Amino acid sequence: MTQTALLQDLEARGLIAQTTDMAALQELLNKESVTLYCGFDPTADSLHIGSLVPILMLKRFQQAGHRPVALVGGATGMIGDPSFKAAERKLNTPDVIEGWVEKIRKQVEPFLSFEGENAAVMANNYDWFGKMNALEFLRDIGKHFSVNAMIKKESVQQRINRDDQGISYTEFSYSLLQGYDFAELNQRLGCKLQIGGSDQWGNITAGTDLTRRLNQTQVYGLTMPLVTKADGTKFGKTESGTIWLDAKKTSPYAFYQFWLGTADADVYKFLRYFSFLSVDEIASIEEADKSREGKPEGQRILAEQVTELVHGKAALEAAQRITHSLFSNDLTNLTADDFAQLAQDGLPTIKLDKSASGLIDALAAGGLAKSKSEARTFIQSGAVSVNGIKVDSLEHAIGDGERLFGQYSLLKRGKKLYALVDWQ
């Protein structure tokens, strides 16, 4: 891909919100292999799916021959970015942040290549801020920032203008830290481009200005739009919570199901944002879906692409196997690990003692019936199955033979209501 084609592709995908100087950036990318960076602050022990857009942007640039730097904010994570946040962040202890830094580093690494001429680099801004004292910070960095200009930034104004929440000097100083990151990475690695979400525009331009002042070097910024949904609800959240990249926090099955549930109004945009299918391929999928009778293919393709990208082929196959088994009512191909995923976050799950094996009690405990009386009615009407096999006896007790892998029984009422029993 030529460098002109790279920016054209990003624009066609809708992935460019703003640049500090598009023409000059285009010229730079055409002229040389550029080192670029994106920062990831450790605000939790895992990144969520909103972080995928910048991670994949680093990957897109690397595939085009440029060198990506993933900067984990071991120092900035101790402060907290106030950008468009309604309230002050909770400050976490250094040892907690250090653990989160390591987890995030391990999450980002698999997306990038650390071999070849444009091998990726992992960095941690604690390496330079940890050695800097307050006087150095105020003299060498602070003197280059105008408080007048900082106060005018939209993200700061939103906090200042709230009666219930102001902004501390700690968070107010955040943009100085992020700005210095750019200057430091420019000095250390020749970094000339910073990318980030559109909410980072103020911090990014602080960095381009500071780098020009400190290093007498022209550098650039590029932001991506924040991911939004057509219905106005928050992207990356479900009724059960945030969708994380860590498989221990969001199972690959739940992750796959999240993408399968994408609205028709969002699916093709998300394919452009989150997949490496070409814009033309995505347009063809959209066109075929318009004329297709029945369910569109876009959601399945999106779920497959992103699940494999994040969790790998084996995890995708497991998610597909679980999905097919539940749909077909045939559990014979499921593994113990598959059931563990369902118990983690795939289905409503209850823990029962093996001595409490009555089906009526289990239906009530699992929320498939409001009462034992209602449970009896459902059983008698043939609406209840255990592990895919219908049960019509009111005296039915769930025996050892129905405890798959000695631990799990899948209860179902009607066509779509499930409860997984995890026997203790």
Curated annotation (Swiss-Prot):
It catalyses: tRNA(Tyr) + L-tyrosine + ATP = L-tyrosyl-tRNA(Tyr) + AMP + diphosphate + H(+). InterPro entries: aa-tRNA-synth_Ic, Rossmann-like_a/b/a_fold, S4_RNA-bd, S4_RNA-bd_sf, SYY-like_C, Tyr-tRNA-ligase, Tyr-tRNA-ligase_bac-type, Tyr-tRNA-ligase_bac_1. GO terms for molecular function: ATP binding; RNA binding; tyrosine-tRNA ligase activity. The keyword Kinase does not apply. Keywords: Aminoacyl-tRNA synthetase, ATP-binding, Cytoplasm, Ligase, Nucleotide-binding, Protein biosynthesis, RNA-binding. GO terms for cellular component: cytosol. ATP binds at K237. It is found in: Cytoplasm. GO terms for biological process: tyrosyl-tRNA aminoacylation. Residues 357-422 form the S4 RNA-binding domain. Pfam families: SYY_C-terminal (PF22421), tRNA-synt_1b (PF00579). A motif ('HIGH' region) lies at residues 42-51. Its EC number is 6.1.1.1. A motif ('KMSKS' region) lies at residues 234-238. L-tyrosine binds at Y37, Y174, Q178. Homodimer. Catalyzes the attachment of tyrosine to tRNA(Tyr) in a two-step reaction: tyrosine is first activated by ATP to form Tyr-AMP and then transferred to the acceptor end of tRNA(Tyr). Belongs to the class-I aminoacyl-tRNA synthetase family. TyrS type 1 subfamily. NCBIfam families: tyrS. This is Tyrosine--tRNA ligase. It comes from Chromobacterium violaceum (strain ATCC 12472 / DSM 30191 / JCM 1249 / CCUG 213 / NBRC 12614 / NCIMB 9131 / NCTC 9757 / MK). The gene is tyrS.
